[in-house]
């Protein structure tokens, strides 16, 4: 494990070899890249960096499904990805980015050839990230396809983070959040080493922040206890950047979407976590020191933002 930590640290720290000020980045991902769309553009702008960012998104999409979608892309009508875009280099409506999603959706080969991307990112679905056997052979196949269709692009891997303690999958896997991190960290490191790819270490930054704040869960409520909560009572996440709880109706995919109830999301970053993710991405992509960033969203207090920026930089530098 120690050798893996050193290897991943080197993969992360090497991003400072070259500093860029303008990049076109395509993310082949899911909701864990959708969250990168929230604050990364604003952090990049504050750091004087020009970032054109596009996200091919299917919620919860694993590498296996991404590759299956590539194999189906011979049918030009097969456009399974919604596309989120942040385009700063020119008017989005006049830019080549519109080629990515002429009908509002896209497939991977089409998107890869629509622009001269500087960087293309991949990642495993969070629910499979701790188990390297789920990566293959799909990661190898996807990497080969990216190299074929976008040979000018550097491929990077976003290391997705471990869940907050309330996620029931941790119980199924018999893992704590820290143990989930250790396993996914090793899995991503194995893939990076195999293909000599750099890592965007979002997971490490989340761990750094949890340690440095620190985040200590004083009470984990049982399902029975949570069922007894009354609006507006919600469980505490103790400052964690992952996880949130609220009262309201569900999302479109929830069977009880029309029911007003306590909703919990222990796997995605909350708004504060999205700022941390943005700092990691900008530091990693552009090789800049985000501890000097003067931007923070209004909902993140300055003292908390300082901890986040330091956690992000330490992760990217491999410290």
Per-range role (PLM):
Residues 1-4:
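Positively charged n-region of N-terminal signal peptides that target proteins for export
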Residues 104-271, 283:
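Alpha-helical cap/lid subdomain in secreted, periplasmic
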Residues 26-28, 158:
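Short hydrophobic segments within beta-strands
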Residues 22-24, 52:
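Residues that mark the start of a beta-strand
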Residues 9-17:
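Hydrophobic h-region of N-terminal signal peptides that target proteins for export
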Residues 254-310:
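Extended, basic/helix-rich recognition subdomains
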Residues 34-139, 164:
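Conserved SGNH/GDSL esterase-like catalytic core that processes O-acyl groups on lipids
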């Amino acid at each position: 494990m120690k050798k893996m930590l050193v290897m991943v640290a080197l993969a992360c720290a090497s991003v400072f070899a070259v500093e860029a000020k303008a990049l076109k980045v395509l993310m082949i991902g899911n909701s864990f890249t959708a969250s990168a769309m929230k604050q990364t553009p604003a952090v990049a702008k504050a750091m004087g960096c020009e970032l054109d960012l596009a996200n091919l998104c299917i919620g919860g999409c694993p590498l296996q499904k991404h590759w299956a979608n590539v194999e189906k892309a011979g049918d030009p009508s097969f456009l399974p990805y919604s596309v989120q875009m942040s385009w700063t280099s020119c008017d989005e409506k006049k830019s080549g980015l519109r080629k990515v999603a002429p009908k509002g959706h896209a497939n991977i080969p089409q998107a890869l050839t629509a622009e001269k991307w500087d960087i293309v990112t991949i990642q495993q679905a969070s629910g499979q990230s701790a188990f390297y056997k789920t990566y293959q052979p799909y990661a190898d196949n996807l990497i080969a396809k990216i190299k074929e269709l976008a040979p000018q692009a550097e491929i990077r891997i976003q290391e997705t983070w471990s869940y907050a303690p309330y996620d029931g999958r941790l119980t199924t896997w018999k893992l704590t959040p820290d143990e989930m991190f250790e396993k996914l960290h090793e899995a991503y490191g194995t893939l990076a080493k195999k293909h000599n790819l750099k890592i965007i270490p979002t997971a490490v930054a989340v761990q750094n922040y949890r340690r440095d704040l620190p985040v200590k869960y004083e009470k984990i409520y049982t399902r029975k206890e949570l069922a007894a909560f009354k609006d507006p009572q919600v469980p505490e996440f103790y400052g964690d950047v992952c996880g949130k709880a609220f009262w309201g109706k569900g999302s479109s995919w929830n069977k009880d979407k029309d029911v007003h109830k306590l909703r919990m999301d222990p796997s995605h970053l909350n708004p504060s976590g999205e700022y941390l993710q943005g700092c990691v991405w900008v530091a990693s992509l552009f090789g800049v020191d985000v501890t000097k960033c003067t931007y923070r969203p209004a909902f993140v207090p300055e003292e908390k933002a300082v901890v986040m920026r330091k956690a992000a930089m330490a992760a990217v530098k491999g410290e």
